């Protein structure tokens, strides 16, 4: 159980988080883990730097408004992970489901196999991650001047509907100190990430335009652990 919060210039945010986890040895080379968590935040939950465009009937920008999110959010999640190993091969498979009272629902599946190479000082670890999310009930990429400003609205893409794929590969080498058999690890990881948004309904003048293009990124990470 953990509490958090901040207060600044008349605005405040408070939260409480609870986590319950169980780890079970299923077999000699198989471990399972189950976590259930609930968190609740209330107060100022807006992003003060996020604004939304207001479009008129032809699709031209008529103005801007700051976002306004509900002042309470409750999230519930379930996480299940299985790890198994056979000789020089091991793998981890996990699934996570989250839902909240903003109608955001997400599912994550991640698979990480690992092959230990010669002398057990080197290994390679591919990775695959799939993610899917629905949008918050107040998410709107833009507003219509004809409809007026709703009570709650946000154009933050992180609250929109999208799915994402991540592919990765890690190579690691253990540097063993022979006198005491302790070692450090040098690793290199490369990942490719692609995020695709669900395209919303748009005014006739904006149809055919890719207003929410896919997000693509390549991450290269070099690590040293000792």
What are these regions (language model features)?
Residues 70-73, 98-107, 118, 214-217:
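Solvent-exposed loop/turn segments connecting transmembrane beta-strands
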Residues 32-36, 89-93, 107, 111, ...:
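Transmembrane beta-strands of outer-membrane beta-barrel proteins
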Residues 1-25, 29, 42, 123-174, ...:
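Outer-membrane beta-barrel translocator/channel fold
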Residues 1-8, 45-53, 95, 104-109, ...:
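Outer-membrane beta-barrel translocator domains and adjoining extracellular loop/strand segments
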Residues 52-62, 145-153, 209-211:
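Surface-exposed loop/turn segments flanking beta-strands in extracellular/periplasmic regions
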Residues 25-31, 85-88, 118-121, 175-185:
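Short loop/turn motifs that connect adjacent beta-strands in outer-membrane beta-barrel proteins
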Residues 14, 38-44, 74-76, 84-88, ...:
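Transmembrane beta-strands of outer-membrane beta-barrel pores
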Residues 169-171, 213-226:
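Outer-membrane beta-barrel "beta-signal"
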């Amino acid at each position: 159980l953990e509490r958090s919060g901040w207060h600044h210039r008349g605005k405040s945010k408070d939260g409480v988080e609870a986590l319950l986890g169980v780890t079970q040895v299923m077999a000699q080379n198989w471990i399972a883990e189950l976590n259930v968590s609930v968190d609740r935040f209330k107060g100022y939950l807006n992003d003060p730097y996020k604004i939304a465009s207001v479009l008129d009937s032809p699709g031209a920008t008529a103005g801007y408004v700051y976002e306004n999110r509900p002042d309470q959010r409750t999230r519930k999640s379930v996480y299940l992970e299985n790890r198994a190993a056979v000789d020089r091969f091991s793998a981890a498979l996990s699934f996570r489901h989250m839902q909240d009272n903003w109608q955001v629902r997400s599912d994550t599946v991640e698979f990480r196999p690992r092959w230990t190479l010669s002398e057990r000082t080197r290994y390679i670890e591919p990775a695959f991650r799939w993610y899917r999310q629905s949008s918050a009930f107040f998410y709107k990429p833009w507003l219509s001047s004809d409809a007026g400003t709703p009570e709650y609205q946000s154009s933050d893409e992180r609250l929109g509907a999208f799915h994402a794929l991540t592919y990765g590969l890690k190579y690691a080498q253990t540097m063993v100190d022979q006198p005491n058999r302790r070692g450090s690890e040098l690793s290199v990881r490369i990942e490719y990430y692609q995020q695709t948004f669900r395209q919303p309904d748009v005014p006739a003048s904006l149809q055919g335009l890719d207003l929410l293009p896919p997000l693509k990124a390549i991450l290269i990470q070099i690590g040293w652990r000792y």
